[in-house]
Amino acid sequence: MYHGTLVHMTQEKTEHQLVEVERVQTGVRIEKRMLKVLKAIVEQKDITLGDLLEGIVLHAFEGKTPFSPQTLKEIEQFKQLYGMTLKAADSHHLKERKR
């Protein structure tokens, strides 16, 4: 998991206490503009998309916010840039466009 300014340093572990895990390759479908925002974050923070997603999920599982106030501001800018208007209330209410 990423241990920089993107993710709050709320974990008791430090950078020197890395946890060994087994990762698997997976394919997921995700909303196009959301992926653009996520890719912009990983590019800016110099991390992988997998690291970002793991950090978001681990924080969510503990009811914690995964982003610093500064990163949240940056995310808002990326959302505007890529026209992402989806909100949390839209979760589980998305319908895929027919091609």
PLM feature segments, named:
Residues 1-32, 42, 83-89, 96-99:
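Short Lys/Arg-rich basic patches
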Residues 1-2, 47, 67-70:
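Short coil/turn linker and secondary-structure boundary residues
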Residues 28-30, 38, 46-58:
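Short amphipathic alpha-helical segments
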